[in-house]
Swiss-Prot record:
InterPro entries: Mn/Fe_SOD (IPR001189), Mn/Fe_SOD_BS (IPR019833), Mn/Fe_SOD_C (IPR019832), Mn/Fe_SOD_N (IPR019831), Mn/Fe_SOD_N_sf (IPR036324), SOD_C_sf (IPR036314). Homodimer. Can also form a heterodimer with SodA. Gene3D superfamilies: Fe,Mn superoxide dismutase (SOD) domain, Iron/manganese superoxide dismutase, C-terminal domain. Its EC number is 1.15.1.1. One of its GO terms (molecular function) is metal ion binding. Fe(3+) binds at residues 27, 81, 161, 165. It comes from Staphylococcus aureus (strain NCTC 8325 / PS 47). Binds 1 Mn(2+) or Fe(3+) ion per subunit. This is Superoxide dismutase [Mn/Fe] 2. It is an enzyme of class 1 (oxidoreductase). Belongs to the iron/manganese superoxide dismutase family. Destroys superoxide anion radicals which are normally produced within the cells and which are toxic to biological systems. Catalyzes the dismutation of superoxide anion radicals into O2 and H2O2 by successive reduction and oxidation of the transition metal ion at the active site. May play a role in maintaining cell viability during the late-exponential and stationary phases of growth since it becomes a major source of activity under oxidative stress. Has a role in resisting external superoxide stress. Involved in acid tolerance and the acid-adaptive response. Induction: Transcriptionally induced by externally generated superoxide stress in a manganese-dependent way. The presence of manganese increases SodA homodimer activity and simultaneously decreases SodM homodimer activity. This occurs primarily due to post-transcriptional effects, since the expression of the gene is independent of manganese availability in the absence of superoxide generating compounds.
Length: 199
């Protein structure tokens, strides 16, 4: 069964002015689609073709060595972007159990955002910043390239794309501005669903 590029759950221009239509078109239709195409080419005709992407990434050490790097990069790229589209929304409301637990752990939502932003804006090169559930607790982590916290047994519930292709058309080298804009379009309802399922 071939992996498929998911449809966006909103229009390309729905996240404006925070993420522009042109960026969304390139990011989804070109970058994400390339990961899917390369992943399918890697796993075609193997047992991995019938495995879930989450299982494949969580058990990367069991992927045959000849395919491991491609699955790590392209499978990771497909998984990460698929989740990223889901946790974005033009209708962002800061509520839910995850918000309460963030406040309980960090003191305030702003303190959490500050720590998350600091990790995102100081990450060298390309990668992702994540809010994960690790042994029932919330934790902010970063990964390089298309790596994923699933490989370390952590469950991702929120993620921020730090690759330049995610923001350069609009923000150029101003990664902190892109980070600030991100909070206006977080789908906290989806984040909370993922959190409740992971606890």
């Amino acid at each position: 069964m071939a992996f498929k590029l998911p449809n966006l759950p909103y229009a390309y221009d729905a996240l404006e002015p925070y993420i522009d239509q042109r960026t969304m078109e390139f990011h989804h239709d070109k970058h994400h689609n390339t990961y899917v195409t390369k992943l399918n080419a890697t796993v075609e005709g193997t047992e991995l073709e019938h495995q879930s992407l989450a299982d494949m990434i969580a058990n990367l050490d069991k992927v045959p060595e000849a395919m491991r790097m491609s699955v790590r990069n392209n499978g990771g790229g497909h998984f990460n972007h698929s989740l990223f589209w889901e946790i974005l929304s033009p209708n962002s409301e800061e509520k839910g159990g995850v918000i309460d637990d963030i406040k309980a752990q960090w003191g305030t939502l702003d303190e959490f955002k500050n720590e998350f932003a600091n990790k995102a804006t100081t990450l060298f090169g390309s990668g992702w910043t994540w809010l994960v559930v690790n042994d029932g607790k919330l934790e902010i982590v970063t990964t390089p390239n298309q790596d994923n916290p699933l490989t370390e047994g952590k469950t991702p519930i929120l993620l921020f794309d730090v690759w330049e292709h995610a923001y350069y058309l609009k923000y150029q080298n101003k990664r902190p501005d892109y980070m600030t804009a991100f909070w206006n379009i977080v789908n906290w309802k989806k984040v909370d669903e993922l959190y409740q399922a992971a606890k």
